[in-house]
Amino acid sequence: MIQQQTYLNVADNSGARKLMCLRVLGTGNCRYGEIGDKIVAVVKDALPNMPIKRSDIVTAVIVRTRQPVNRASGMSIRFDDNAAVIINADGNPRGTRVFGPVARELRDKSYTKIVSLAPEVL
Protein backbone atom coordinates (compact mmCIF):
# COMPACT_ATOMS: atom_id res chain seq x y z
CA MET A 1 0.00 0.00 0.00
CA ILE A 2 1.69 3.12 -1.27
CA GLN A 3 0.02 6.44 -0.60
CA GLN A 4 1.02 10.10 -0.66
CA GLN A 5 4.19 10.97 1.29
CA THR A 6 5.44 7.34 1.23
CA TYR A 7 9.19 6.97 0.72
CA LEU A 8 10.36 4.30 -1.73
CA ASN A 9 13.76 2.93 -2.69
CA VAL A 10 14.71 3.10 -6.36
CA ALA A 11 15.39 -0.35 -7.83
CA ASP A 12 17.31 0.74 -10.94
CA ASN A 13 20.51 2.52 -11.93
CA SER A 14 18.92 5.77 -13.13
CA GLY A 15 20.76 7.81 -10.51
CA ALA A 16 17.98 8.35 -7.98
CA ARG A 17 18.09 6.54 -4.63
CA LYS A 18 14.94 7.62 -2.76
CA LEU A 19 11.54 8.74 -4.01
CA MET A 20 8.58 10.27 -2.21
CA CYS A 21 5.17 9.49 -3.68
CA LEU A 22 3.10 12.53 -4.65
CA ARG A 23 0.16 10.84 -6.40
CA VAL A 24 -0.99 7.35 -7.34
CA LEU A 25 -2.11 7.37 -10.98
CA GLY A 26 -5.00 5.45 -12.50
CA THR A 27 -6.65 4.32 -9.29
CA GLY A 28 -9.67 6.61 -9.47
CA ASN A 29 -10.92 7.40 -5.98
CA CYS A 30 -8.68 4.81 -4.27
CA ARG A 31 -5.84 6.30 -2.23
CA TYR A 32 -3.43 3.37 -2.28
CA GLY A 33 -1.10 1.98 -4.92
CA GLU A 34 -0.21 -1.70 -5.28
CA ILE A 35 2.47 -3.52 -7.28
CA GLY A 36 2.29 -2.49 -10.93
CA ASP A 37 0.63 0.88 -10.32
CA LYS A 38 2.12 4.08 -11.71
CA ILE A 39 2.99 6.90 -9.33
CA VAL A 40 4.21 10.47 -9.65
CA ALA A 41 7.10 11.04 -7.26
CA VAL A 42 9.81 13.52 -6.35
CA VAL A 43 13.45 12.48 -6.08
CA LYS A 44 14.61 12.97 -2.48
CA ASP A 45 18.12 11.48 -2.76
CA ALA A 46 20.24 11.08 -5.89
CA LEU A 47 23.76 10.18 -6.90
CA PRO A 48 25.96 13.05 -8.13
CA ASN A 49 26.73 13.53 -11.85
CA MET A 50 23.71 11.56 -13.02
CA PRO A 51 20.88 12.67 -15.35
CA ILE A 52 18.22 12.49 -12.60
CA LYS A 53 18.75 15.15 -9.95
CA ARG A 54 17.31 15.77 -6.51
CA SER A 55 13.86 17.44 -6.55
CA ASP A 56 13.06 16.19 -10.09
CA ILE A 57 9.46 15.08 -10.64
CA VAL A 58 9.39 11.58 -12.17
CA THR A 59 6.94 8.82 -13.05
CA ALA A 60 7.64 5.39 -11.57
CA VAL A 61 6.16 1.90 -11.32
CA ILE A 62 5.86 0.15 -7.96
CA VAL A 63 7.78 -3.16 -8.09
CA ARG A 64 7.93 -4.20 -4.39
CA THR A 65 5.77 -3.46 -1.34
CA ARG A 66 5.93 -4.45 2.30
CA GLN A 67 2.17 -4.96 2.30
CA PRO A 68 1.42 -8.62 1.39
CA VAL A 69 -0.07 -9.23 -2.05
CA ASN A 70 -2.66 -12.02 -2.18
CA ARG A 71 -2.66 -14.13 -5.31
CA ALA A 72 -5.49 -16.18 -6.83
CA SER A 73 -3.72 -19.41 -5.84
CA GLY A 74 -4.10 -18.48 -2.17
CA MET A 75 -0.42 -17.62 -1.73
CA SER A 76 0.61 -14.21 -0.44
CA ILE A 77 3.95 -12.55 -1.07
CA ARG A 78 5.62 -9.61 0.64
CA PHE A 79 8.99 -7.92 0.31
CA ASP A 80 11.39 -6.29 2.76
CA ASP A 81 11.05 -2.79 1.31
CA ASN A 82 8.93 -0.51 -0.84
CA ALA A 83 10.63 0.01 -4.20
CA ALA A 84 9.91 1.51 -7.60
CA VAL A 85 11.50 1.73 -11.06
CA ILE A 86 11.58 5.12 -12.82
CA ILE A 87 9.97 5.03 -16.27
CA ASN A 88 9.68 7.43 -19.21
CA ALA A 89 6.53 8.51 -21.04
CA ASP A 90 6.49 5.31 -23.12
CA GLY A 91 6.53 3.08 -20.03
CA ASN A 92 10.12 1.89 -20.53
CA PRO A 93 12.60 2.08 -17.64
CA ARG A 94 15.02 5.04 -17.65
CA GLY A 95 17.81 2.90 -16.21
CA THR A 96 19.50 -0.06 -17.86
CA ARG A 97 19.51 -2.41 -14.85
CA VAL A 98 16.97 -3.44 -12.21
CA PHE A 99 18.17 -4.46 -8.75
CA GLY A 100 16.45 -7.00 -6.53
CA PRO A 101 13.46 -9.24 -7.14
CA VAL A 102 10.22 -8.01 -8.68
CA ALA A 103 6.70 -9.43 -8.49
CA ARG A 104 5.09 -11.54 -11.23
CA GLU A 105 2.14 -9.12 -11.32
CA LEU A 106 4.26 -6.73 -13.43
CA ARG A 107 4.11 -9.16 -16.35
CA ASP A 108 0.30 -9.15 -16.19
CA LYS A 109 0.31 -5.33 -16.30
CA SER A 110 2.52 -5.37 -19.45
CA TYR A 111 5.77 -4.11 -17.93
CA THR A 112 7.71 -6.88 -19.66
CA LYS A 113 10.85 -4.75 -20.12
CA ILE A 114 11.19 -4.34 -16.34
CA VAL A 115 10.55 -8.06 -15.81
CA SER A 116 13.21 -9.00 -18.36
CA LEU A 117 15.82 -6.75 -16.69
CA ALA A 118 15.12 -8.07 -13.18
CA PRO A 119 17.45 -10.74 -11.77
CA GLU A 120 14.56 -12.62 -10.12
CA VAL A 121 10.78 -12.71 -10.58
CA LEU A 122 8.71 -13.94 -7.63
From Swiss-Prot:
PROSITE patterns: RIBOSOMAL_L14. It holds the Pfam family Ribosomal_L14. Binds to 23S rRNA. Forms part of two intersubunit bridges in the 70S ribosome. This is Large ribosomal subunit protein uL14. Part of the 50S ribosomal subunit. Forms a cluster with proteins L3 and L19. In the 70S ribosome, L14 and L19 interact and together make contacts with the 16S rRNA in bridges B5 and B8. Belongs to the universal ribosomal protein uL14 family. NCBIfam families: rplN_bact. InterPro entries: Ribosomal_uL14, Ribosomal_uL14_bac-type, Ribosomal_uL14_CS, Ribosomal_uL14_sf. It comes from the Bacteria. One of its GO terms (molecular function) is structural constituent of ribosome. One of its GO terms (cellular component) is cytosolic large ribosomal subunit. GO terms for biological process: translation. It comes from Crocosphaera subtropica (strain ATCC 51142 / BH68) (Cyanothece sp. (strain ATCC 51142)). Keywords: Ribonucleoprotein, Ribosomal protein, RNA-binding, rRNA-binding. The keyword Secreted does not apply.
